[in-house]
């Protein structure tokens, strides 16, 4: 079989990068596939910290599979086509390893799919290493651990599955790190946003969801102080409005998450703000509102928006 590109979603986070790099290695070792891990964007601050810590080179960034002369791909940490490579509909999806909802996904041929409602795609990839009797190199254990820490906010997010806890402990041992100490330093590295422009800030960790025919962009930034982000509200709103016009979003929802106190502020703009307010049972004042206890886009934001938009 010819080369297969393995990649996570656009605007890759630590789980997208870690799961794709590790799975590409596993696919070679376990099944003899000619795989290459690539990325659909440059690493964010948190992921750059992870790669540097474990001495792993960032995957090269690609925009099109066809431009690489590749006809076959494997997706990790996503399945929705609008979150994937630009020519996803023109290539063969060989397999998917994911922990999100399945939506806007269709293939012409059968494929391998591994979907589990766990805290991270990295958790699933680690299990697949064990199932296939493949040892996890120290640096890949570090990447997989980081993906799990990132997606579950160090196992504090409601997306954390009971099985994620022993996985985190095992990966920390394999990676040679203290779970709590490394996890906190890693998460803090991702909150250093002062050098980011407003346009960059709203695109660090952003995904587009098709909700009842509407293109809704849901972005998330982590911080240790929500007010640091809200102090830039004016320029952030300008960037959001530009993104709405340029990309054709109906609505843009920015989730500003306090990783210390496990709360979020929702900043939202667009044409369906009544639906956004109904989703969270709050009232937007000056385009934002507090959402107590919310840290997970996947579990505490997207399902609520989906229900509201479909009502």
Swiss-Prot record:
Its EC number is 3.6.1.1. One of its GO terms (molecular function) is inorganic diphosphate phosphatase activity. Phosphorylated on serine residue(s) by stk1. Dephosphorylated by stp1. InterPro entries: DDH_dom, DHH_sf, DHHA2, DHHA2_dom_sf, Mn-dep_inorganic_PyrPase, Oligoribo/pAp-PDE_c-di-AMP_PDE. Keywords: Cytoplasm, Hydrolase, Manganese, Metal-binding, Phosphoprotein. Mn(2+) 2 binds at residues 15, 77, 99, 151. It is found in: Cytoplasm. It comes from the Bacteria. Its main location: cytoplasm. This is Probable manganese-dependent inorganic pyrophosphatase.
